[in-house]
Amino acid sequence: MIRAFDQLSLPLLRWLDAEDAHRLAIQGLKLLPAIKPRPDDAKLAVRAFGLNFPNPVGMAAGFDKNAEVPDALLRLGFGFVEIGSVTPRPQSGNPRPRLFRLERDEAVVNRMGFNNDGAEIVLRRLAGRANQGGIVGVNVGANKDSADRVADYVRLIETFAPVASYFTVNISSPNTPGLRNLQQAAQLNELLSKVLEARDRVRRKAGDTPVLLKIAPDLSLAELDDVVHVARSRGVDGMIVSNTTLARPNSLREQLRAKEQGGLSGRPLFRLSTRMVAETFVRVEGAFPLIGVGGIDSGGAALTKIRAGASLIQLYSSLVYKGLGLVESIKADLTSTLLRTGRDSLSEIVGADAATITAEDWPV
């Protein structure tokens, strides 16, 4: 079914404007039959953040911003789905065009600006799937015109706690002016303090929902030191490394499109994001797990990210070029690697190459 979907959809979607193609893909997923996914090999199971993931391959935030198709994505083989980013109030985001393919680089530049339907509508959709099972995280962000961004995050934690498998506090999008300033130590300390207090207030009715922090790949190592220190001292449950980058690697071939303002994702982000996973892993010292995201487009790339320090991984931009069949391909490659090396689980290789990667020259 997935192969047929890719064969029919990929050629058509590539002819469309990138954002129109995304909208059509969402509508197409709504039409897929509700078929149970093939069970995952037990070797792929991951225990992280107090949750049991059937496999380590997740759909990153940004694809299903409004919780329209989380169950369709789970049926296609994802081990978990992250919806959002969601803001308290609906917002339209930045003017179009705001999403650009860099075809020859297998990359994407976006400046979407947290366009979403708002907390009320997204909550209604998630509440409607409450009995479906599966891990569905909620990525939360602040409204662009908010007078108190910390209060926005607190409100979203309180709102979505009954329906979220986990939360991702997104302070690393480059497309909301000033948002990345929340990664600075003093501001981050205040934010996490209030977010975790909010989580604890609703614990009795919603359980102990894990809270993860998503960071930018453009942090300096000194800034990363501060972020990890605050995250550990405040007791977050994990981190996602990383969001899109404002940098433009020297290797880019689509130079004209690369000049578009916004965050770069896809294959050119792989080396930088993987380096940041490794740098974060050595600083975390096992205090909590990491989710690695950025440029994963094959089983080999997924394995590299895991060996850099990621317990779980997420995809998005690579699906634009490889199709949804990439999910099963990555899982098959990871299973084959475990069988070939005589290992029982991926946890045995998480961070195996972190020290080596952090000793390499910085990616440019």
Swiss-Prot record:
Record's cofactor remark: Binds 1 FMN per subunit.
Domain of life: Bacteria
GO cellular component: cytoplasm; plasma membrane
Keywords: Cell membrane, Flavoprotein, FMN, Membrane, Oxidoreductase, Pyrimidine biosynthesis
Catalytic reaction list: (S)-dihydroorotate + a quinone = orotate + a quinol
EC number(s) given by UniProt: 1.3.5.2
Coiled-coil regions, chain positions: none
Residue sites binding FMN per the record: A61, G62, F63, D64, K65, S85, N139, N170, K214, S242, G266, G295, Y316, S317
Alphabetical GO biological process terms: 'de novo' pyrimidine nucleobase biosynthetic process; 'de novo' UMP biosynthetic process
Binding sites annotated in the UniProt record for substrate: K65, N110, R111, M112, G113, F114, N170, N175, N243, T244
Location(s), subcellular: Cell membrane
GO molecular function: dihydroorotate dehydrogenase (quinone) activity
Pathway: Pyrimidine metabolism; UMP biosynthesis via de novo pathway; orotate from (S)-dihydroorotate (quinone route): step 1/1
Annotated Pfam families: DHO_dh
UniProt keyword Flavoprotein, yes or no: yes
Active site (record annotation): S173 (nucleophile)
Family statement drawn from the similarity comment of this UniProt entry: Belongs to the dihydroorotate dehydrogenase family. Type 2 subfamily.
Subunit structure: Monomer.
Function: Catalyzes the conversion of dihydroorotate to orotate with quinone as electron acceptor.
Name this protein carries in UniProt: Dihydroorotate dehydrogenase (quinone)
Gene behind this protein: pyrD
